[in-house]
Amino acid sequence: MVLIRVLANLLILQLSYAQKSSELVIGGDECNINEHRSLALVYITSGFLCGGTLINQQWVLTAAHCDRGNMLIFFDVHSLKGLNKDVQSRVAKEKFICPNRKKDDEKDKDIMLIKLDSPVSNSEHIAPLSLPSNPPSVGSVCRIMGWGAITSPNVTLPGVPHCANINILDYEVCRKAYTGLPATSRTLCAGILEGGKDSCKGDSGGPLICNGQFQGIVSWGAHPCGQSLKPGVYTKVFDYTEWIQSILAGNADATCPP
């Protein structure tokens, strides 16, 4: 009953944002149901929506700015308009955010680990995505996915996850696009220089997958989404692998890299 009620609320949320529009998704298409096995839908009871990535049977990685109180995490969700009998739902038992994260800057160290109240079971449409063994190189083709907006600035939420291919860009592209970025950063700059492909509202916390490896977490970007010379900024997962492994090993006091 809880699952039915929550998915009904998600549908209401999706319909409440919908605008009459013939525009296509921001550079992407509906994901193949077999390509988002690690994608988690992170739902907060207030209606706030994020994505996440299953990294093993009991842990999900998402963005720290998605931390909004009580969380329900769903797996094997495709359409928000209909119940899939194989959907698995879990409660966030514990949440871990970098202890050295700047409290007044939600863009800083935008990464959060969620421990589920019980492990999920692998299935045809549920499987974890392993952490990266190396960082991505500039020019790498990467996949973004999520239930986020398919039009911007007028928001239309699609009700099914959409996927698009973007590229890893030189960090200097983002420094030119957004004032105030530091000279070095534990983030990835990714997008299409001419615009038209981008993550957007509701995609936060979802994965950036490059050559089959989980390389980034959707963090922030320009509004409206998909502007030329305004790529997205993604948390660089590779730089946090030691912290992630420490938390998974039981070291709750582990500190993130500066």
UniProtKB/Swiss-Prot annotation:
Disulfide bonds join C31-C163, C50-C66, C98-C256, C142-C210, C174-C189, C200-C225. Residues 19-24 form a propeptide. The active site is at H65 (charge relay system), D110 (charge relay system), S204 (charge relay system). Its EC number is 3.4.21.-. SMART domains: Tryp_SPc. Residues 1-18 form the signal peptide. Residues 25-249 form the Peptidase S1 domain. Glycans are attached at N154. It comes from the Eukaryota. It is found in: Secreted. Keywords: Disulfide bond, Glycoprotein, Hemostasis impairing toxin, Hydrolase, Protease, Secreted, Serine protease, Signal, Toxin. Expressed by the venom gland. GO terms for cellular component: extracellular region; secretory granule. The keyword Glycoprotein applies. GO terms for biological process: proteolysis. Pfam families: Trypsin (PF00089). Snake venom serine protease that may act in the hemostasis system of the prey. Monomer. Belongs to the peptidase S1 family. Snake venom subfamily. This is Snake venom serine protease.
